[in-house]
C-alpha cells in the first residue's frame, strides 16, 4: 500500500563486466568510466609523490634494498576515490568481500549513545540479510536474500599465504563468527559464481511490483523542503528539470559522499559554508560533511613468473585467459570468478588490543595504484589496511552544480598514531611474506628496508591510499555534530532520513558493504514500524 520511487544517477547494471567477478578491476580503471564516479581527493598534506627504483629484494635479508628518494620530490599527492554509479551502487563494482566488522565496533556505537545499535541489536539484521552457503549457526543464516559463498577459485598462492601466516597467527574459517582474529580465505557476495550485488539480491525480485518505479540516468539536484519537511526532490533527466513529489518521506542513500553533498545543495549544513556557495540555509546542521573516516591501505607487489597469477601485461596470462574465459562460461569457476583479493587476515599490532587493528588482503595479481599502473608480468600483492584510523576529514560541495565533483579531504595520516600503526602493520605483513613458502618469491617491485622505520614511513606516504570504505559524513548520534538520530531521521527536519554508510559514527573494523546492508535492513524495520506498514 506504499509506492516507492528509486532514483539512480547512473545507468542500469546490465554490463557483463559488473556480473563477472574478476572484471570489476576494468570498471574501476576505465578511462571513461560509465559505472563509477572517478573521484579524487584534494591534495593530501601527508602524502608525497615519491617513487622508488624497481628492483629485486631478498625477503630473507629484511626485504632488501634501501628506499631511495629521488631528487624531484613532490608533495601533496591526490588519492583516488571511485564510487559505484549504477543500480546496486558500490556493491556492483566492489571486490565482493563479505565482512561485518568486529563486535566491539557496534558496542562502541551504542556506548556513544546510539541505543539499539549494539552488536546484539544489529546481529539479527546481518542474519536477516544473509543467505550463507557455508554456515548456519548463531552468527549466520542460510536463507536471506544476500547470497554469501566460498570463492570458486582454488589458487595455490593463497594456500601458501595461509601456510606462511599460520606459522605466526591462528587460522580461521570465518571472519564473521565468534572471533574475527586470524588468517584465512574470504567469503564473497556471489551466487553461482556471479556477483550478487544489492541490485541482484533485493531490487531484481521487486521489479515486478506495480508500486515500484525505478529511474536510472537521473541526477538528483536537491531536496525541496516546505516548513522544514521534505516534500519533493528536484531531478535532472537528460538535462531537463523534473520535480518528484513524495507523500511520506525521502530516503537519501547516496553514500558517504553523495548524501552529505545532496543535503548541502538542499540548504542543510553549515550556514557560513552554504552561503559561501550562494545556497540559502534551510536548516543549520554543522555536522553535514564532517567526520569523514576511511581505511588507508598500503600495498606491496611481488613479481612471480607463474601460470597461476594474473597480469594485465603478462604473456602467460594472455595465453591462459581464453581457457579461463571458457572455464568460467561452462562452470562459473576459475580466475574470472575470483575477487582477486582471495586471502586475508585480521591481526593485532599489539597483544593488549581488544580487537584486530589491521586487515590484510592477499591478491592474485599485482594491483599497483588501484590497478591503474600497468605492471608487466605476473605476480601477487598484499595489502595492509588500518582498521580504525584516528585521522578525520571532510567532504563538501565544490559548488551548487550537481555535476561538479565534491571536494573530498580524508586528511589521511594527519593523526600521528595512524602512521605508527601502519608502520607496525607493514612489519606484520612482511613477516608473513618473509616466511616459507612465500619467502622464495623475492622479486619485490618497491623494496623497503624493514628495519628502517623512516624508510617505511616514506613508502607509506608515497604509495598508500584508500581501500574504498568512506563513512561517517552524516553521522548518527545525539551530540552537536550528529546529523541523524538512531531512527536515521535528520535532526531538526521531517520526512527525510539517511540510510547508508554515512550514518556510521565510527569506522568498523572491516569492509563496509555488509554493514551498510545491515543498516538498510534495520532502517526498513524502523520505517515499517513508524509508518505502521
Where are these regions (language model features)?
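N-terminal redox-cofactor-binding region of secreted/periplasmic oxidoreductases
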Residues: 1-533
Amino acid at each position: 500500500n506504499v509506492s516507492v520511487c528509486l532514483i539512480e544517477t547512473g545507468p542500469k547494471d546490465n554490463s557483463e563486466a559488473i556480473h563477472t567477478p574478476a572484471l570489476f578491476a576494468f570498471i574501476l580503471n576505465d578511462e571513461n568510466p560509465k559505472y563509477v564516479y572517478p573521484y579524487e581527493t584534494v591534495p593530501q598534506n601527508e602524502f608525497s609523490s615519491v617513487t622508488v627504483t624497481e628492483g629485486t629484494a631478498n625477503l630473507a635479508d629484511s626485504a632488501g634494498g634501501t628506499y631511495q628518494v629521488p631528487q624531484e620530490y613532490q608533495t601533496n599527492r591526490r588519492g583516488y576515490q571511485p564510487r559505484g554509479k549504477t543500480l546496486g551502487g558500490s556493491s556492483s563494482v566492489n571486490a565482493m568481500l563479505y565482512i561485518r566488522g568486529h563486535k566491539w565496533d557496534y558496542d562502541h556505537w551504542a556506548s556513544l549513545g546510539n541505543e539499539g545499535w549494539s552488536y546484539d541489536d544489529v546481529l539479527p539484521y546481518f542474519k536477516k540479510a544473509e543467505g550463507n552457503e557455508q554456515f548456519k549457526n548463531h552468527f549466520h543464516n542460510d536463507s536471506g536474500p544476500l547470497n554469501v559463498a566460498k570463492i570458486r577459485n582454488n589458487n595455490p598462492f593463497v594456500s601458501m599465504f595461509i601456510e606462511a601466516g599460520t606459522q605466526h597467527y591462528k587460522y580461521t574459517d570465518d571472519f564473521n563468527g565468534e572471533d574475527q582474529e586470524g588468517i584465512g580465505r574470504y567469503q564473497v557476495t556471489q551466487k553461482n559464481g556471479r556477483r550478487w550485488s544489492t541490485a541482484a539480491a533485493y531490487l531484481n525480485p521487486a521489479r515486478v511490483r506495480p508500486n515500484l518505479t525505478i529511474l536510472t540516468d537521473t541526477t538528483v539536484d536537491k531536496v525541496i523542503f516546505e516548513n522544514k519537511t521534505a516534500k519533493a526532490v528536484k531531478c535532472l533527466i537528460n538535462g531537463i528539470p523534473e520535480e518528484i513529489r513524495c507523500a511520506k518521506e525521502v530516503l537519501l542513500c547516496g553514500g558517504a559522499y553523495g548524501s552529505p553533498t545532496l543535503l548541502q545543495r538542499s540548504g542543510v549544513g553549515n550556514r557560513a559554508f552554504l552561503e559561501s556557495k550562494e545556497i540559502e540555509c534551510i536548516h543549520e546542521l554543522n555536522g553535514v560533511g564532517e567526520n569523514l573516516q576511511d581505511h588507508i591501505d598500503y600495498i606491496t607487489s611481488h613479481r612471480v613468473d607463474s601460470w597461476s597469477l594474473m597480469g594485465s601485461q603478462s604473456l602467460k596470462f594472455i595465453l591462459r585467459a581464453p581457457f579461463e574465459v571458457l572455464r568460467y562460461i561452462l562452470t562459473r569457476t576459475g580466475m574470472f570468478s575470483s575477487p582477486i583479493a582471495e586471502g586475508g587476515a585480521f591481526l593485532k599490532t599489539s597483544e593488549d588490543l581488544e580487537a584486530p587493528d589491521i586487515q590484510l588482503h592477499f591478491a592474485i595479481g599485482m594491483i599497483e595504484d588501484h590497478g591503474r599502473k600497468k605492471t608487466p608480468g605476473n605476480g601477487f600483492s598484499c595489502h595492509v589496511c588500518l582498521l580504525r584510523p584516528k585521522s578525520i576529514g571532510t567532504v563538501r560541495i565544490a559548488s551548487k552544480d550537481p555535476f561538479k565533483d565534491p571536494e573530498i579531504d580524508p586528511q589521511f595520516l594527519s593523526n600521528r598514531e595512524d602512521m605508527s600503526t601502519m608502520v607496525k602493520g607493514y612489519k606484520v605483513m612482511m613477516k608473513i611474506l618473509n616466511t616459507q613458502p612465500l619467502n622464495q618469491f623475492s622479486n619485490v617491485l618497491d623494496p623497503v628496508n624493514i628495519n628502517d622505520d623512516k624508510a617505511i614511513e616514506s613508502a607509506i606516504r608515497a604509495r598508500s591510499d584508500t581501500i574504498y570504505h568512506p563513512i561517517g559524513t552524516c553521522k548518527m548520534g545525539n551530540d552537536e555534530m550528529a546529523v541523524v538520530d538512531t531512527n536515521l531521521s535528520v535532526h531538526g527536519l521531517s520526512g527525510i532520513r539517511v540510510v547508508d554508510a554515512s550514518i556510521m559514527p565510527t569506522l568498523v573494523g572491516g569492509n563496509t558493504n555488509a554493514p551498510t546492508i545491515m543498516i538498510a535492513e534495520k532502517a526498513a524495520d524502523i520505517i515499517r514500524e513508524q509508518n505502521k506498514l
